[in-house]
Amino acid sequence: MESGIPTYREKQTGFWACHNPERLETAKAFRENPSLVWGWYLWRRQQFSKAQPNAAHLALREMAGSMGTVSIITQNIDDLHERAGSVDVLHLHGSLSKPKCFACHRPGMVRNESAIMEEGALIEPPRCTRCNGKLRPGVVWYGEDLLPDVWKSALSLVKSCDVLISVGTSGIVTPAADLPNIALACGATVIHVNTVDVGMGAPNEIMLIGRATQILSHLSAFLSRELNSP
């Protein structure tokens, strides 16, 4: 949101106001109208490319620089963390920049388009170089499970961390919503950063209410001072 990317729960505008993202982002929708779904994702990819990392992304990168091991687990499918300079980023729901074959699931490649996408354009998906199947976005669609190796990596990181900072999550989308509870159960301190109180009342839990850009910037500056003080 603070980078200018609307959430799924925001009202879309223009052509896409007539299409529910939760219906477009399914395997069924892709089978029935691949050109519509592919056009939707290319349009979204174009919107993402216009966005810039915000102060929250930059603060997380700075924390990694001053604290050593900082891993980022994100539900976002954009590349703003990477463009901010973060290296250890795990995308639970996949990445918009990494398509794969709908038939054989082999990773594919899509060239970066410099032309401005027309909103609502119907675009035929490119083909897989191995089986000639249609390429689909490399993201987790509604009704699909997370990739097992990705979820396994996320669990390993959460179970072994000292501190988990949970930023902006609604607590609705599972299994990602379970990660703070898992960290608490393993003895980690959990810091919630949100505009509303989402804490669960655990003794090793901290609730920071406000915008992620402001709170993470202050937290990064505070940690830097503490770590660099004599």
From Swiss-Prot:
It is an enzyme of class 2 (transferase). GO terms for molecular function: histone deacetylase activity, NAD-dependent; NAD+ binding; protein-malonyllysine demalonylase activity; protein-succinyllysine desuccinylase activity; zinc ion binding. It is found in: Cytoplasm. Binds 1 zinc ion per subunit. Zn(2+) binds at residues 101, 104, 128, 131. Disulfide bonds: none annotated. Its cofactor is Zn(2+). Its main location: cytoplasm. The keyword Chloroplast does not apply. Its EC number is 2.3.1.286. The keyword Signal does not apply. InterPro entries: DHS-like_NAD/FAD-binding_dom, NAD-dep_sirtuin_deacylases, Sirtuin, Sirtuin_cat_small_dom_sf, Sirtuin_class_III, Ssirtuin_cat_dom. The active site is at 93 (proton acceptor). Keywords: Cytoplasm, Metal-binding, NAD, Transferase, Zinc. Substrate binds at residues 41, 44. NAD(+) binds at residues 75-78, 168-170, 194-196, 212. Residues 1-226 form the Deacetylase sirtuin-type domain. Belongs to the sirtuin family. Class III subfamily. NAD-dependent lysine deacetylase and desuccinylase that specifically removes acetyl and succinyl groups on target proteins. Modulates the activities of several proteins which are inactive in their acylated form. This is NAD-dependent protein deacylase 1. The gene is cobB1.
